[in-house]
Amino acid sequence: MAAPGGAASCEDFAEFQELLRVMRTIDDRIVHELNTTIPTASFVGKVDPGQTCRELYESLMDAHTNRERIIKNCISQTSAVVKTLKEEREKAHEDAALLKQLRKEQTKLKLMQSELNVEEVVNDRSWKVFNERCRIHYKPPKSQ
């Protein structure tokens, strides 16, 4: 399996999904992260919540950008495979193995496209939690 910052293998959908699961750890742990790093009123002087929120913001942005890049790259690669298989099928109408491979790749493409929707939900949830806890400590740049 590829490293979270590296290139993903788009051949095996289960491996692709596992990579995304690992890369989504930051989003899964955001509530815990905020609860353990953003101080309550009684501990305000011991931690700089502005710095903590800024670092978390940067980590979230990097994670979201990397995952989106990987998903879109795999969609692009799989789309190219589907296109090639469709062209081959036009030449060999009766090839059952080719048709089976085409259907498999089309299914994988649909699953990868659905990961974009999952990504949107995960990101929205993370930004909602981040904004609820960090809005008074850190104002992110307007690009979000």
From Swiss-Prot:
Belongs to the MIX23 family. This is Protein MIX23. GO terms for cellular component: mitochondrial intermembrane space. Keywords: Coiled coil. Residues 82-120 form a coiled coil. Disulfide bonds: none annotated. The gene is MIX23. It holds the Pfam family MIX23. The keyword Coiled coil applies. PANTHER family: COILED-COIL DOMAIN-CONTAINING PROTEIN 58, PROTEIN MIX23. It comes from the Eukaryota. Signal peptide: none annotated. InterPro entries: MIX23 (IPR019171).
